[in-house]
Amino acid sequence: MQAYQREFIRFAIERGVLRFGEFTLKSGRTSPYFFNAGLFNSGSALAQLGRFYASAVIESGLDFDVIFGPAYKGIPLGAATAIALAEQHQRDLPWCFNRKEAKDHGEGGTLVGAPLTGRVLIVDDVITAGTAIREVMQIIQAQNAEAAGVLIALNRQERGQGEGELSAIQEVERDYRMPVISIVSLEQVLEYLADDVQLKQHLPAVQAYREQYGI
C-alpha cells in the first residue's frame, strides 16, 4: 500500500465517509462497511480529495488529454482533480462536465468547460452498476473523443448480483477496453484494518463479506 492510500483511508474514516457496522446496500446485501463520498463536503476536504485522486492517476501512468466530471457528483471531483494536478504535479490540463439538461440559450448544449476531445479521463466517486459510465461513454463517443480510463475513489472488488458474475468495474473494463483506477480498493482497506488496533475488531466481518461477494 502506498503512503497516499493509507492517508486516504485514514482521511475517509475521520470524515465519516468510510464507516464500519451493518449497512443495507441498494443491492439488498448487508455490508459491514459503507462509503459515502458525499461527506467530503467542505472546502478543505474537497481539496484534499482532489490531491488523492491526482496521486492515484499519476501513480497509474495513464496518458490522457482532458478531465471529464459527469453530472452531478463527478463535477466537483473533476474540478478538484484538475486543480490538484496543476498545483501538485505541474500538469495543467483542460477539464469539462456535462449538464443533465441541454440549454437552449447562451452557449447552449450539454457540455461546459473545455472541448471534449482526445483521450478523456472520467472522474467519479464509485462505480456501482456501471450505468452512469455507459451514459458517459455515449457523450464521449458523440464528440468523437476516446475514453482513456475512469478514476474513482474506492473499488469495492465485489461481483454483481449473479453467481460468478464479474464486478461492475470489471464489466466496464471489458466492455470499453479501458482501465478503472481507484485511490484504494477493498484489499487496502482490509490491510489498514489489520494494522489498526482500534479498528481491527471490524476485520473479520469485512473479510467474511469479501469471501462471500468478492472477486
Swiss-Prot record:
Signal peptide residues on this chain, from the entry's feature table: none
Binding site for orotate: 34-35, 128, 156
The reaction(s) this protein catalyses: orotidine 5'-phosphate + diphosphate = orotate + 5-phospho-alpha-D-ribose 1-diphosphate
InterPro entries documented for this protein: OPRT, Or_phspho_trans_dom, PRibTrfase_dom, PRTase-like
CDD domains: PRTases_typeI
GO biological process: 'de novo' pyrimidine nucleobase biosynthetic process; 'de novo' UMP biosynthetic process; pyrimidine ribonucleoside biosynthetic process
MF GO annotations: magnesium ion binding; orotate phosphoribosyltransferase activity
EC class: transferase
The keyword Glycosyltransferase belongs to this UniProt entry's keyword annotation: yes
Subunit structure: Homodimer.
Similarity comment: family membership: Belongs to the purine/pyrimidine phosphoribosyltransferase family. PyrE subfamily.
Functional summary from the UniProt entry: Catalyzes the transfer of a ribosyl phosphate group from 5-phosphoribose 1-diphosphate to orotate, leading to the formation of orotidine monophosphate (OMP).
Protein name according to UniProt: Orotate phosphoribosyltransferase
Classification of source organism: Bacteria, Pseudomonadati, Pseudomonadota, Gammaproteobacteria, Pseudomonadales
